[in-house]
């Protein structure tokens, strides 16, 4: 494996291009990332910048430091809930010839860096996407507009930052679904309706790309916002249903044409996930493999353990990273990634891997009708 600092400029450009394709936003691939200098938006803010945080009513409170602003806003540390998981989309009528059914619940994207931006008076705000797009979780973040507005108001640089609790309450989720599929790959997918018609159109088109014989219905659901921007939203669920009617070695083909397979096996008491991916020219095998491994981690948690509990008003009750059921590193299987030779144009491959691993993980449960299919992970408050 090449050490990033030894890459030639051409090799580094190729690595960053692959990372851009997988993450959806420009990425930095070099030693600085490992040293904590990844280029996140908040890293470049002036040290004397004011700090703005949200109060309990959703208004911005400004202070000389983050601690001052949080104190003024009355911010309370989030906790996890003991409430049971709910499946918000009711299962539609299931015909007698249906082969499989599936219901999913709310899950939290749980991206590493909460939304942040900063802006000087009269300037352009730093992008909250920073060194990555949080797989669609930050596409509509409010922090850049807030930083610009507050910098002009106070005539000083302002950092606008969301807490982890804010990202959970405000950030978009993948829409929960309920649906079924027949052996001939026709089916029905009922999707929690996102807020915009554009999102609904995008979801409908992406689902049709992988499951052309599916009917898609949108239903209103009380809950946090959902969006088509979240990784493989809608089409991954449809692809998983379709894959359940095919041989396990059949590839999952994403709307962009990337293909992937996944298999889960026991090897001396240790779980191993084998992934095969075809996504055009690799550009950088190390970067591509790392994104595929990350996609496998995300998929396994989605199927087995992740959920986000909301109250009757749709407000999330789980407000800490540990409460989301994200698969712990100690519980992560070994992931083997085979990259298929392909001289075609490079395209995103990890989203296809995400869907393929989810399909394999679901198969391993015996096609449990609800996700999360395993016991919910609880590792503290």
Role assignments for model-derived ranges:
Residues 70-71, 112-113, 135, 282-285:
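Short helix/loop capping segments that flank catalytic or ligand/cofactor-binding pockets
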């Amino acid at each position: 494996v090449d050490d990033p600092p030894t890459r030639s400029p051409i090799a580094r450009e190729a690595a960053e291009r692959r990372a851009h394709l997988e993450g959806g936003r420009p990425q930095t691939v070099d030693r600085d990332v490992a040293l904590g200098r990844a280029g996140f938006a908040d890293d470049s803010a002036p040290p004397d910048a004011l700090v703005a945080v949200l109060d309990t009513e959703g208004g911005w409170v400004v202070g000389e430091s983050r601690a001052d602003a949080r104190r003024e806003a009355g911010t309370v540390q989030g906790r996890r809930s003991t409430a049971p998981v709910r499946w918000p989309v009711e299962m539609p009528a299931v015909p007698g010839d249906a082969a499989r059914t599936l219901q999913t619940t709310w899950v939290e994207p749980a991206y590493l860096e909460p939304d942040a931006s900063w802006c000087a008076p009269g300037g352009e705000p730093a992008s909250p996407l920073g060194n990555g797009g949080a797989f669609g979780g930050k596409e509509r973040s409010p922090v850049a507009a807030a930083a610009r507005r507050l910098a002009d108001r106070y005539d000083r640089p302002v950092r606008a930052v969301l807490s982890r609790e804010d990202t959970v309450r405000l950030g978009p989720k993948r829409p929960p679904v309920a649906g079924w599929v027949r052996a001939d790959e026709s089916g029905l997918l009922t999707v929690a309706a996102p807020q915009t018609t554009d999102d609904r159109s995008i979801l409908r088109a992406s689902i049709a790309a992988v499951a052309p014989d599916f009917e898609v219905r949108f239903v209103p659901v009380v809950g946090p916002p959902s969006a088509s921007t979240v990784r493989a939203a809608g089409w991954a669920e449809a692809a998983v249903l379709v894959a359940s009617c095919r041989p396990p070695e059949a590839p999952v083909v994403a709307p962009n044409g990337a293909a992937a397979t996944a298999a889960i096996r026991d090897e001396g008491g240790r779980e191993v996930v084998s992934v095969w991916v075809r996504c055009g020219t690799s550009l950088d095998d190390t970067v591509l493999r790392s994104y595929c491994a990350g996609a496998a981690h995300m998929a396994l948690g989605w199927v087995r353990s992740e959920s986000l509990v909301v109250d009757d008003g749709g407000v999330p009750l789980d407000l800490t990273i540990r409460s989301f059921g994200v698969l712990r590193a100690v519980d992560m299987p070994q992931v083997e990634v085979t990259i298929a030779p392909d001289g075609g144009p490079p395209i995103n491959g990890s989203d296809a891997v995400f869907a393929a691993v989810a399909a394999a993980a679901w198969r391993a449960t015996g096609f449990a009708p609800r996700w999360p299919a395993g016991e919910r992970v609880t590792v503290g408050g």
